[in-house]
C-alpha cells in the first residue's frame, strides 16, 4: 500500500516538475543580469527555488546611518486653521446671541401677559424683574466676549426697560414726571 502511494506521489511530483519547468523565464525578459530565471529543484530536500532571486542572500550591511527628514513634513495650512477657528467662533457667537434673544423674548412675553391681565398687583413684577436681570446678564456677557457691540447691548437693555415702564404706566404703578420747560 505504501509503495502504491509513493508511486502516486512521485508521479505527481514529476508532472508538477514538468509543468514548472515550462514556467521558467529566460534572461531576455529581465534586463538586469543579476536576476536569474526561476527553475524547479529536482531534489526536494533543497529549497524550492534554489537558483531564483533571493533578497536575503545578497543582503550586505555597510554601516549605520541616521536619516532625519524634517523638511519633508508639510506645515499645517494656516488658512485652514483660521477657517476652523472661525467656524468654532461662529457657533459660540451664535449660541450667545440666541441666548440673548431667548431671554429678551421671555421678558416681552411676561410683560405682554401682565399688561393684558386686569387687576394685576406690583408683586407680579418681581419674577419679571428677575427675568430682566437674567437678560441683562446675558447681554453683558455677550459684550465681554465680543459677540455684541456695546451700543447694541445698551439699545437692547433700554428696550427691555422701556417695555417694563410701559406696563407700569398702563397699570398706574408709575407716573412719569413732567420735565420743566424753560421759557
UniProtKB/Swiss-Prot annotation:
Transit peptide, residues from-to: 1-68
GO cellular component: chloroplast; small ribosomal subunit
Keyword terms: Chloroplast, Plastid, Ribonucleoprotein, Ribosomal protein, RNA-binding, rRNA-binding, Transit peptide
Chain coiled-coil ranges: none
Lineage: superkingdom: Eukaryota
Protein localization: Plastid, Chloroplast
Protein's GO biological process: translation
Region (Disordered): 79-99
A single GO molecular function term of this UniProt record: small ribosomal subunit rRNA binding
InterPro entries for the chain: Ribosomal_bS20, Ribosomal_bS20_sf
Principal cellular location given in the protein's record: plastid
Signal peptide: none
Role summary: Component of the chloroplast ribosome (chloro-ribosome), a dedicated translation machinery responsible for the synthesis of chloroplast genome-encoded proteins, including proteins of the transcription and translation machinery and components of the photosynthetic apparatus.
Subunit field text: Component of the chloroplast small ribosomal subunit (SSU). Mature 70S chloroplast ribosomes of higher plants consist of a small (30S) and a large (50S) subunit. The 30S small subunit contains 1 molecule of ribosomal RNA (16S rRNA) and 24 different proteins. The 50S large subunit contains 3 rRNA molecules (23S, 5S and 4.5S rRNA) and 33 different proteins.
UniProt family annotation: Belongs to the bacterial ribosomal protein bS20 family.
Protein name: Small ribosomal subunit protein bS20c
